[in-house]
Structures are given as C-alpha cells and as structure tokens.
Amino acid sequence: MKITLKRKNIYLIVLFYSIAAILSAIYIENILGYLPCKLCLYQRIPFIFSIFFCFLGYYYFKSDKILIYLILLFSISFIIAGYHFGIENGFFEEFGGCSANNLEIISKKELLESLTINISCKDAIFKIFGVSLSGWNTFISLLIVIISLRILFYEKNK
C-alpha cells in the first residue's frame, strides 16, 4: 500500500501543526508559566506566516509559488530551531540577544529586574520524551521541507 500526500493535504497538515504549535507555546507560556527565550519567540514567526500560506495554498493549490514559500518558511524554521537545539546541547555559543535583555539599563533596580527576567537560550526548560521543543521543531520542520519538496518535484515529473 503506497501512501501519497496530495498538495491540499500537506497544506491541511501543516496548517493544523502550525496552529497546534502556536497554541501549545501560548499554553506553556501563559498557563504553565514557563517563559520563552528569544530564540523560542523567533521560532514562532514561521508558524504564524505558515498559517496564512496554508490557507492560501489550500484554495490555490495549483500554484507552485505558495508551496515554495512554505518550503522557504520551514527551511528558516529548521535553521532557527536547529541553531537553538545546538545552543541547548553545547554545539554553538549563545548570541548576544540570548544573554542580555536590554543594554540601555538606567538604574540598579532595572538591572536587577532584567537579570531575573532574562531567559537563557541554552536552558531547555520544557521537554517532551526527553527532547526539547526546539529539537522537535528541528525534526518536524525538516520533515515538512522534505515532504513538500517531494510533492513539488513528484507532481512536476508526473
């Protein structure tokens, strides 16, 4: 039995995954009380844009441009998440944005407050089955890119 994914189906799958990822991040942050680091926030951006492109792609599924945009978005997501996962596991150093919230601190009180709020990118606070959310995002983003490329090239060579 051969499983084939049609273009409309990939848009629906990615749409539901993107919505679930955003809602999960909001739940983890606001209900469970885990504060995200800057890279965690950056990883949400491709998901927000992908929701828009998935709606477009579902209705205009014959256009290659929308699928290519989706591939680019999740390639960016893969890079950001992979970099974040690398920081968490010590493969890369934290960039300046991870370690300092605000360089324009005026008073001692603001300095102390910024130290308590600052979240390090190398601390994986929330894990599922022992893998951080950035690790899962890296894997799933790469999977979406591979499946989307397969659909794009398979339909062209069909």
Whereabouts are the PLM-identified features?
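Short, Lys/Arg-rich, polar N-terminal cytosolic tail immediately upstream
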Residues: M1-L5
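Membrane-interface helix caps and helix-loop-helix hairpins in membrane proteins
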Residues: N30-K38, G86-I87, K127
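Extracytosolic (periplasmic/ER-lumenal) interhelical loops and adjacent juxtamembrane/interface segments
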Residues: G90-S134
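A hydrophobic membrane-anchoring alpha-helix module
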Residues: I117-K158
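Interfacial segments of alpha-helical transmembrane regions
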Residues: K6-F16, Y60-F78, I146
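Membrane-interfacial alpha-helical segments at the cytosolic side of multi-pass membrane proteins
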Residues: I48-Y60, L142-F153
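Non-cytosolic membrane-interface motifs at loop->transmembrane helix junctions
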Residues: G33-R44, G96-S99
